[in-house]
Every structure is written in structure tokens, then in C-alpha cells.
């Protein structure tokens, strides 16, 4: 195995430490698992052209206008979206269907909106 050095935000490290204490694993094992998950997900996403899925977005009310505008720009892949207020934030579930690159582009633009805390893509392949 190779050794690497890593610099992360203090808050993120605190969250990692909470997880590793619950899971009873080392930081190294946690990071190894996270990297394996990311690589597998990236590899899987890169091999499939057409997808159907859902994007979960968590944000505050400042982002509503930007998200609605972005959805209209991607109406070729957005099937429907549902907005749910929850504990002072908004959770939006966006059903999507289309080409992989277009979906990834849309997801990345959602992530780029300043008031968006999370934009998580979940997809399945269309055979």
C-alpha cells in the first residue's frame, strides 16, 4: 500500500471521527472505503450513456429562483421535481431521464449554486 497525506477542514474531520468511532474503523480504513466507493461510482457513471434517476437537493430559500431557472434550462432531462420544506431548509427531489453527460452537467451546476448544501445524484442504467 502507498501512504498519502491529506488536508481537510476541521469540521469535516470531526464528522469523520464521529463515523469512525461508530463504525469502529481507523481513519485510513474510512478514507480507503470512501475512495473505493467514489472510484466505483465514477467508473459506473462513465460507462453508461442513458440514465434515469433522481437528484436530491438540500438548500435554503435563497436558492429557489436559481434552481427553478436551472431546471428550465434542463427541461429536456427534468421529468418532475418535488419540493419539501424540512427544518428550515428545503429538500427537492428532481426526477431525471437522459444522457449521462447532460445529467452530470446539470448535477454539477446544482452543486455550484451557493445556497445548495447537497446535490446527490442517484441513477440506474437504461438497458
Curated annotation (Swiss-Prot):
InterPro entries on file: Acetolactate_synth/TF_NikR_C (IPR027271), ACT-like_dom_sf (IPR045865), Arc_rbn_hlx_hlx (IPR013321), CopG (IPR002145), CopG/NikR_regulator (IPR050192), Ribbon_hlx_hlx (IPR010985), TF_NikR_Ni-bd_C (IPR014864)
Family: Belongs to the transcriptional regulatory CopG/NikR family.
Superkingdom of the organism of origin: Archaea
Protein name in UniProt: Uncharacterized transcriptional regulator MJ0080
Listed GO biological process terms: regulation of DNA-templated transcription
Keywords noted in UniProt: DNA-binding, Transcription, Transcription regulation
GO molecular function, one term: DNA binding
Any one Pfam family match given in the protein's UniProt record, by short name: RHH_1
Species assigned in the record: Methanocaldococcus jannaschii (strain ATCC 43067 / DSM 2661 / JAL-1 / JCM 10045 / NBRC 100440) (Methanococcus jannaschii)
Coiled-coil region(s): none
Amino acid at each position: 500500500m502507498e501512504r498519502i497525506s491529506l488536508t481537510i477542514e476541521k469540521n469535516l474531520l470531526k464528522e469523520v471521527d464521529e463515523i469512525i468511532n461508530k463504525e469502529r474503523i481507523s481513519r485510513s480504513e474510512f478514507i480507503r472505503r470512501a475512495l473505493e466507493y467514489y472510484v466505483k461510482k465514477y467508473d459506473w457513471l462513465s460507462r453508461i450513456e442513458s440514465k434515469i434517476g433522481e437528484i436530491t437537493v438540500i438548500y435554503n430559500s435563497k436558492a429557489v429562483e436559481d434552481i427553478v431557472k436551472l431546471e428550465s434550462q434542463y427541461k429536456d432531462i427534468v421529468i418532475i421535481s418535488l419540493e419539501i420544506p424540512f427544518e428550515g431548509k428545503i429538500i427537492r427531489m428532481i426526477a431525471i431521464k437522459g444522457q449521462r453527460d447532460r445529467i452530470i452537467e446539470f448535477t454539477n451546476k446544482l452543486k455550484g449554486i451557493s445556497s445548495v448544501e447537497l446535490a446527490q445524484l442517484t441513477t440506474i442504467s437504461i438497458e
